């Protein structure tokens, strides 16, 4: 999951810091033997045997000294030819997040059952075979970033050379290369699957790998943020006077209003409605905001009425906000009078409001619903099913380790704000067979879908290469897989995309 929506903090940082048992630390012998177990799963009416491996891969520096370990779980189909069998590497974002969310919620062989747009009931939690797994299409490797999961920075290593956008890419590249070597997967079709900050990681990573002789067949970008300069926050470079953030946020805000039936005479189709709002946002709204203080009063009033109609926010609030309502303010204001605050990761989720006077949310509703279920279920799964034995605690994030080194260095190639669109452009140009799938949730205020399609539509690719980007839009939020209906649609779209990509010659 997880990308920051609150200025001056990293996603989940506050939650992680509140749990002292999750503190970054070292153990005398953090590297333990892999666990290897056998399982089976029924997909599309067919039973498949598969092998699950949980373990660590140690990274080394230029002097061949071990610096850190990265934890992973890999699921490989029994009896398949590894020379032709695809392999997909999954990772979450943060930066700092472990890959618990994708591992336990998306396309692996098991899935945690959580509340869909509702609070998950308390323990015991339910873990089921995942009928939406992609294991019949690809082998699956879920990778936790350095110093998260069961991975640790090893004694004597310089953490500042491990954290940061460029260092992080080098770590993932080395992990992938060592995995390919260890399991002789060099001939396998290779895919990258990143969520949230995992999407700029993917853009940098695919470019880096290909420029170092490791070809990639396809990249899945779920809930993208390739250009921080277009983000709906001023934390990493988008100035608060930059109107793009309000334009990109509007269709997402409208989707949440549609979901809660706050839109009079709205179309029954969510897709039709948000595309109607998109046309307004990129047209009349964009043009009027560009006029700034020169916008005529009559036109100002017209936009006030339109924003009220699309979002359900009061005209008084819209006037006071000077027509500009970013995602955080919308989430706090939308049902303020009911004492409710919407979730940034998924606007369908809500919590009772802590402070009705606060301009932005104090708590994240999506986290409140799912975090305990995911953490408990994964720990049980590792112990009872994968039989992975270690003295270490599983770290849901590397945030404390990062904080001990200062801050995450977002500079990429010496530049800020972080903008990895050029990396993806270069990767798609260098490898004209590369295919990209962009997955987006309509209710995601963290990485608004309109910002994503704007970014991907401005890579300045030649048209034949631009056509290699496919899109999926789903009735869900940042973590598309939280909605089983959206997960089923996402699975089917990806299955078709994989098959199409694997037929590229």
How would you name each of these model-derived features?
Residues 475-486:
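Catalytic histidine-centered segment of alpha/beta-hydrolase-like enzymes
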Residues 134-138, 145, 162-180:
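Alpha/beta-hydrolase active-site loop
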Residues 109-113, 207-312:
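A catalytic-pocket lid/entrance helix-loop region that shapes and gates access to the active site
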Residues 1-22:
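Gram-negative bacterial Sec-dependent N-terminal signal peptides
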């Amino acid at each position: 999951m997880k990308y920051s929506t609150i200025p001056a903090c990293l996603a989940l940082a506050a939650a992680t810091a509140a749990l002292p048992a999750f503190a970054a630390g070292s153990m005398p012998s953090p590297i333990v033997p892999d666990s290897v177990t056998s399982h089976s799963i029924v997909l599309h009416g067919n039973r498949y045997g598969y092998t699950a491996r949980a373990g660590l891969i140690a990274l080394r520096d230029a002097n061949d000294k071990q610096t850190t370990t990265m934890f992973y779980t890999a699921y490989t189909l029994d009896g398949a030819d590894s020379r032709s069998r695809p392999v997909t590497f999954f990772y979450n974002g943060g930066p700092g997040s472990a890959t618990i969310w994708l591992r336990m919620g998306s396309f692996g062989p098991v899935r945690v059952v959580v509340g869909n747009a509702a609070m998950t009931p308390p323990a015991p939690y339910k873990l089921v075979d995942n009928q939406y797994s992609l294991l019949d299409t690809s082998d699956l490797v879920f990778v936790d970033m350095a110093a998260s999961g069961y991975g640790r920075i090893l004694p004597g290593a310089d953490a500042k050379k491990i954290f940061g956008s460029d260092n992080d890419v080098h770590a993932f590249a080395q992990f992938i290369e060592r995995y390919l070597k260890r399991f002789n997967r060099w001939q396998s079709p290779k895919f990258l699957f990143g969520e949230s900050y995992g999407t700029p990681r993917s853009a940098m990573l695919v470019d880096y790998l290909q420029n170092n002789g490791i070809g990639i067949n396809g990249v899945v970008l779920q809930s993208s943020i390739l250009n921080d300069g277009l983000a709906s926050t001023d934390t990493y470079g988008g100035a608060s006077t930059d109107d793009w953030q309000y334009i990109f946020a509007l269709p997402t805000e409208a989707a949440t209003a549609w979901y809660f039936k706050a839109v009079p005479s709205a179309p029954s189709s969510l897709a039709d409605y948000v595309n109607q709002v998109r046309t307004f946002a990129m047209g009349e709204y964009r043009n009027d905001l560009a006029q700034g203080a020169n916008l005529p009063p009559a036109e100002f009033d017209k936009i006030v009425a339109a924003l009220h109609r699309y979002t359900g926010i009061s005209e008084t609030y819209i006037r006071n906000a000077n027509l500009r309502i970013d995602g955080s303010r919308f989430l706090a204001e939308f049902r303020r009078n009911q004492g409710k605050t919407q979730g940034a990761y998924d606007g369908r989720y809500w919590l009772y409001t802590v402070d009705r006077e606060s301009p932005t949310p104090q708590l994240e509703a999506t986290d409140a619903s799912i975090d305990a279920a995911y953490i408990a279920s994964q720990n049980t799964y590792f112990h009872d099913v994968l039989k992975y034995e270690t003295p270490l605690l599983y770290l849901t994030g590397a945030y404390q380790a990062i904080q001990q080194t200062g801050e995450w260095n977002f500079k990429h190639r010496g530049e800020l704000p972080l903008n990895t669109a050029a990396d993806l452009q270069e990767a798609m140009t260098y490898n004209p067979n590369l295919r990209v799938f962009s997955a987006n949730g309509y209710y995601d205020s963290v990485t608004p879908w309109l910002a994503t399609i704007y970014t991907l539509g401005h890579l300045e690719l030649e048209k034949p290469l631009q056509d290699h980007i496919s899109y999926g839009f789903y009735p869900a939020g940042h973590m598309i897989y939280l909605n089983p209906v959206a997960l089923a649609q996402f699975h089917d779209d990806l299955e078709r995309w994989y098959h199409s990509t694997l037929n590229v010659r």
